[in-house]
Curated annotation (Swiss-Prot):
Biased composition (Low complexity): 770-781
Gene that encodes it: IGDCC3
Name of the protein in its database record: Immunoglobulin superfamily DCC subclass member 3
Domain Fibronectin type-III: 426-520, 523-618
Domain of life according to the entry: Eukaryota
Compartments reported by the entry: Membrane
Segments for region (Disordered): 722-743, 762-814
Extent of the signal sequence: 1-35
Species for this entry: Homo sapiens
Glycosylation sites: 93, 246, 381-382, 580, 604, 634
GO annotation, biological process: cell-cell adhesion; neuromuscular process controlling balance
SUPFAM superfamilies (UniProt xref): Fibronectin type III, Immunoglobulin
Annotated S-S bridges: 63-117, 160-209, 259-307, 351-400
Length: 814
């Protein structure tokens, strides 16, 4: 739907000199320094890491800090500072020792949790990454090995599953004796799987799974392996008994993708990636008869792996697949850098981290989470921290913490605020008063002290509902204590505060003040009208959802142009963008009005006229186009198709010859019509007063007419849109020779312009000649209108209807 977007009334541009003065004020400030003794920055040399502790045993959490002494080190557990006690001891190097690790069920004190090392000196405070400390445990087996029967020469598989911290080491016993791991027919997988290939009678026995870690040792139930007689002579289709599982690992771990295949003859097992990329050879090995082992996995190893079992010498194959996801803990691509800035200026820190999944970035100020608000802004997924109008309270150590499901990392930087002596205080008595719907006047008093060196003021402006990063500034002369802020939005609350600037720096900010602009009625909405049928119209416009916020919407009126009163108002919400009118008089010309309203009243209306005679789908007052060319093209195309289907090739040739002999007469006639339309040489004539009568009063006279009482000159409408009843009346115009070629048809027009304009006015001689020949020649062949209206124009009648052919008149306001 090609409807133009509603444009708010144009505001006068804001004065240029405040924008030019602001950079001049900033140039007079002292140049910033990029660092003050970075060698003395407070930072961690060693941070605590995740660990598993044995209940009742001691554990040490490492932490070493570098920085300007004295440095105070404390520890937090789950975000709460640990008090000094005999249960835990702070070592001289900053590490924490827990003497007897506790794991008490049922809500009793436990030492499990997330630990952080906190270091502080006179410049600020930093917090280490979180280290998760868990107790070593061992559960019972939740999957025991099952009894298995295998054929001699075949494959047997046992599996057990158990949870524990740290991850248990799985070994196997046969008849209570550890199996021989040097036997190449026995394959032990780390996830608790035992595979035996090439089964023999001596492989039979009872197998146990043994799990062990620092917490405990567990032995599973026994499972018997029975080896039956050889069935090697029988053919068996290849089959995959066990395929690869979906795995999620962290970088540098080992991936084990299992694939156990059977068949006779023994199938060949191969591996590939579903995406077609090569698996590679570095760190890759095949364990047993088909298990894929990837050592030291990286993010690039992520993907879907396909195990295929092929019968030798044939294309018979079976496949199974599993997905490997490799995660990478967060690490920094760009660390924040320590900076120093003059008071009143802007400080910016940048911190970029990468990982898989992408890490989330959080900022800390002296160990406390820092969120956006006030003069603090976070952009680019929190990777950029901006602090505007810095003051002494902003001097601190800022940390960037990047964290994902695979791990976390932190980096810190220090902000030093250069505060010169003799800076002025904040401006006083700041007031903001609404002047109009787009202007607010802000006034203030100069600071109490140190005013002699003031070189200007900077006014900070933003919508009260907007985030701080959308704030903008305007500079004001030092001798001015008020400023008119223009180009604002109606019915909108704004926040204002001011700073005084000297060559040494800026003052602190004044107390913010709020003011709302006055409201106004909305602008006229753009309106398009489409003829859907002989008695229906479709009205199209752009929705304005904001009207609903101001108790507003749209009002729709319509009437036959011959009537005095309108039907309406039809009230529509601001979110609606179309409306259909039906059961209309197919012989009438309709006037349609659409206006927007809010709590401040009704806006100006957009008016459209449209005729339903000879109804076909048309667009009223559509964007500029050469309608005569379009109609001629459509008629030529349609005629060609109908003739080609119903008459045949012979009739096509006949019609072409007929058109060739008739074209010359039509061109000559249209040239005569165009000469009648062309204005005389010399000064341009005034617009036809009859056309102006159709459009109502001029701009200066609009206020004298009632909005709903204005009527259209019906004599003019009858000439432009003759009623259907006129078909039976004698035509007072000169008769047209039936043998003469038909000029442009009057009833082809369905659009009435709202402002006077001449068809040929302002056109070059070449353009006139072009429009007077080919387009008109095409229209001359148009059939008479079905409603019985006049179908032909004489040369003397072409002047006024031709002026009504313009399809893009200038918009008028009701």
């Amino acid at each position: 739907m090609a409807v133009q977007r509603a444009a708010s009334p144009r505001r006068p541009p804001a004065p240029l000199w405040p924008r030019l003065l602001l950079p001049l004020l900033l140039l007079l400030l002292p140049a910033p320094s990029e660092g003050l003794g970075h060698s003395a920055e407070l930072a961690f040399a060693v941070e605590p890491s995740d660990d598993v502790a044995v209940p009742g045993q001691p554990i040490v959490l490492d932490c070493r800090v570098e920085g300007t002494p004295p440095v105070r080190i404390t520890w937090r557990k789950n975000g709460v500072e640990l008090p000094e006690s005999t249960h835990s001891t702070l070592l001289a190097n900053g590490s924490l020792m827990i003497r007897h690790f506790r794991l008490e069920p049922g809500g009793s004190p436990s030492d499990e949790g997330d630990y952080e090392c906190v270091a502080q000196n006179r410049f600020g405070l930093v917090v280490s990454r979180k280290a998760r400390i868990q107790a070593a445990t061992m559960s019972d087996f939740h999957v025991h090995p099952q009894a298995t029967v295998g054929e001699e020469g075949g494959v047997a598989r046992f599996q057990c599953q158990i949870h524990g911290l740290p991850k248990p080491l799985i070994t196997w016993e046969k008849n209570r004796v550890p199996i021989d791991t040097d036997n190449e027919r026995y394959t032990l997988l780390p996830k608790g799987v035992l595979q035996i290939t090439g089964l023999r009678a001596e492989d039979g026995g009872i197998f146990h799974c043994v799990a062990s870690n620092i917490a405990s040792i567990r032995i599973s139930h026994g499972a018997r392996l029975t080896v039956s007689g050889s069935g090697s002579g029988a053919y068996k289709e290849p089959a995959i008994l066990v395929g690869p599982e979906n795995l999620t690992l962290t970088v540098h771990q080992t991936a084990v993708l299992e694939c156990v295949a059977t068949g006779n003859p023994r199938p060949i097992v191969s591996w590939s990636r579903l995406d077609g990329r090569p698996i590679g050879v570095e760190g890759i090995q095949v364990l047993g008869t088909g298990n894929l082992i990837i050592s030291d996995v990286t993010v690039q190893h992520s993907g879907v792996y396909v195990c295929a079992a092929n019968r030798p010498g044939t294309r018979v194959r079976r496949t199974a697949q599993g997905r490997l996801v490799v995660q990478a803990p967060a690490e920094f691509v760009q660390h924040p850098q320590s900076i120093s800035r003059p008071a009143g200026t802007t400080a910016m820190f940048t911190c970029q981290a990468q990982g898989e999944p992408p890490p989330h970035v959080t900022w800390l100020k002296n160990g406390q989470v820092l969120g956006p608000g006030g003069h603090v802004r976070l952009k680019n997924n929190n990777s950029t921290l901006t602090i505007s109008g810095i003051g002494p309270e902003d001097e601190a150590i800022y940390q960037c913490v990047a964290e994902n499901s695979a791990g976390s990392s932190q980096a810190s930087a220090r902000l030093t605020v250069l505060w010169a002596e003799g800076l002025p205080g904040p401006p006083r008595n700041v007031r903001a008063v609404s002047v109009s719907s787009t202007e607010v006047r802000v006034s203030w008093s100069e600071p109490l002290a140190n005013t002699k060196e003031i070189i200007g003021y900077v006014l900070h402006i933003r919508k009260a509902a907007d985030p701080p990063e959308l704030e903008y500034q305007e500079a004001v002369s030092k001798s001015t204590f008020q400023h008119l802020v223009s180009d604002l939005e109606p019915s909108t609350a704004y926040s204002f505060y001011i700073k005084a600037y000297t060559p040494r720096g800026a003052s602190s900010a004044s107390v913010p003040t709020l003011a709302s602009t006055l409201g106004e009625a909305p602008a006229p909405p753009p309106l398009s009208v489409r003829v859907l049928g002989s008695s229906s119209l479709q009205l199209l416009w752009e929705p304005w959802p904001r009207l609903a916020q101001h108790e507003g919407g749209f009002k729709l009126f319509y009437r036959p142009a011959s009537k005095t009163s309108f039907t309406g108002p039809i009230l529509l919400p601001g979110t609606v963008s179309s409306y259909n009118l039906s059961q209309l008089d197919p012989t009438a010309v309709y006037e349609v009005k659409l206006l927007a309203y809010n709590q401040h009243g009704d806006g100006n209306a957009t008016v459209r006229f449209v005729s339903l005679r000879g109804a076909s789908e048309r667009t009223a007052l559509s964007p500029p186009c050469d309608c005569r060319k379009e109609e001629a093209a459509n008629q030529t195309s349609t005629t060609g198709i109908v003739i080609g289907i119903h008459i045949g090739v012979t009739c096509i040739i006949f019609c072409v010859l007929f058109l060739l002999f008739g074209q010359r007469g039509r061109v000559l006639l249209c040239k005569d019509v165009e000469n009648q339309l062309s204005p005389p040489q010399g000064p341009r004539s005034q617009r036809d007063p009859g056309i102006l009568a159709l459009n109502g009063a001029r701009r200066g006279q609009r206020g004298q007419l009632g909005r709903d009482e204005k009527r259209v000159d019906m004599k003019e409408l009858e000439q432009l849109f003759p009623p259907a009843s006129a078909a039976g009346q004698p035509d007072p115009r000169p008769t047209q020779d039936p043998a003469a070629p038909a000029p442009c048809e009057e009833t082809q027009l369905s659009v009435l312009p709202l402002q006077g304009c001449g068809l040929m006015e302002g056109k070059t001689t070449e353009a006139k000649t072009t429009e007077a020949t080919a387009p008109c020649a095409g229209l001359a062949a148009a059939p008479p209108p079905p409603d019985g209206g006049p179908g032909l124009l004489s040369e003397g009648q072409a002047s006024r209807p031709a002026a009504a052919r313009v399809t893009q008149p200038a918009h008028s306001e009701q």
